[in-house]
Regions:
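N-terminal secretory signal peptides that target proteins for export/translocation
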Residues: 1-7
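Predominantly soluble domains enriched in secretory-pathway, periplasmic, or organellar proteins
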Residues: 22-369
């Protein structure tokens, strides 16, 4: 999704938070021992599982990709957060042939961009095409832009992160292949919808963070163990930052800090001037991170895998915490839902989380700090 998307060596201090989902390893001595609890409301969305979501801040609508219990992933929910209700559900293409995975919004042109996969039978073989779906958010008419295809059986990767730059009208799509395929970063002009592939990585890109003001793009290469800094004006890599299996990245432009979450559950703060890690937060299974420039808090979504696998349905399975710029944990929120997604409406400073408990999905609404 697009968001307008220490000092000297010291002994690490480790603290437990809540159910010990998170421990904090920091280079600062001051931190909150007892973070307060977020003020949270929620609404039931339905029986389908949320996959990805993005918000149109102009209309106060959240668009979410949802998966059914039978594995269909072509369902789009439209949630009006002003009315606190789902106002529409739309099927994009065919439930047997179209599988959407990630979503971004162009609010100025009323367009939804979704990364996904389209299955086509060619000469008796099922070919899986990595596909960009361009969806009109008014009438939900759509077109598919096929990027790369191979036989479905044995296909080892797919499109991953998606981000949109409204200043240049450009879509960015990460292509992640741990084996074979066509890994890299697609750069797609929003007017012509013609793709260019940057293929400078062995395995490709998992997540993307844009900074339109500096014309820089940060691309997290999960299996290459690095974050590439790309000049958007010429699509050239100007720097590479070593990072351990980055799965999510977010940017504090004011302090010039890039936060990255790795597959090991650790969230690192990287000083973009020195390219050095200046602090770390150790989680168990961090799924998403997002920095909010309005309240200057870093939001972290973490999961407790032991409790998720447990038969006990009344235990904490996910936690969201907010960390300030000096690594104080300010607030936390625990739930027995499995939470993956977090978005922020920059106009209202409202934070939204989506989760699923095996029976129902919920939208959690965190009141502004």
């Amino acid at each position: 999704m697009y968001e307008y998307r220490s000092s000297r060596r010291a002994l690490f201090t480790i603290i437990s938070v809540g159910i010990a989902l998170l421990t904090v390893s920091i280079l600062h001595s001051g931190y909150s021992q007892s973070p307060s609890t977020f003020s949270v409301s929620s609404m039931v969305l339905g029986k389908d599982k949320p996959v990805s979501m993005a918000i149109d801040e102009k209309t106060s609508k959240i668009y979410g990709i949802f998966a059914t219990s039978s594995g269909e992933k072509n369902l789009l929910y439209v949630i009006d957060v002003a009315q606190n209700k789902v106002i529409d559900t739309i099927k994009i293409g065919s439930q047997k042939n179209d599988f959407l995975t990630n979503i971004a919004i162009d609010p100025d042109r009323s367009i939804i961009y979704a990364a996904g996969q389209h299955l086509v039978n060619e000469n008796g073989s099922d070919i899986a095409y990595d596909t960009l779906y361009v969806i009109n958010s008014t009438n939900y008419k759509f077109k598919r832009i096929q990027l790369y295809g191979e036989t479905e059986e044995g296909k080892e990767g797919s499109l991953a992160g998606i981000s949109f730059n409204p200043v240049t009208n450009t879509i960015y799509l990460g292509s992640l292949y741990p084996e074979g395929g066509k890994p890299g970063l697609y750069v797609i002009d929003g007017k012509s919808l013609q793709p260019i592939l940057i293929d400078k990585w062995q395995y490709g890109i998992k997540d993307i963070q844009l900074d339109p003001e500096s014309h820089l793009l940060y691309a997290g290469a999960k299996y290459d163990n690095l974050i590439s800094v790309i000049d958007e004006s010429n699509n050239l890599i100007i720097d590479n930052i070593t990072a351990q299996s980055p799965i999510a990245i977010t940017l504090d432009k004011e302090k010039n800090i890039l936060y990255e979450a790795g597959s090991d559950g650790k969230v690192n703060a990287i000083d973009l001037k020195s390219k050095k890690n200046i602090s770390s937060i150790q989680g168990e299974s961090v799924k998403n991170i997002l920095y909010n420039p309005n309240d200057k808090l870093l939001y972290i979504v973490d999961q407790n895998l032991t409790n998720i696998l447990s038969k006990n349905s009344n235990v904490t399975k996910s936690m969201a915490i907010a960390v300030n710029t000096t690594n104080n944990i300010i607030n936390k929120f625990e739930t027995d839902f499995i939470v993956d997604n977090i978005i922020i409406n920059p106009s209202t400073n409202q934070v939204y989380l989506s989760g699923y408990d095996g029976n129902n999905s919920k939208l959690f609404i965190i009141k502004p700090q």
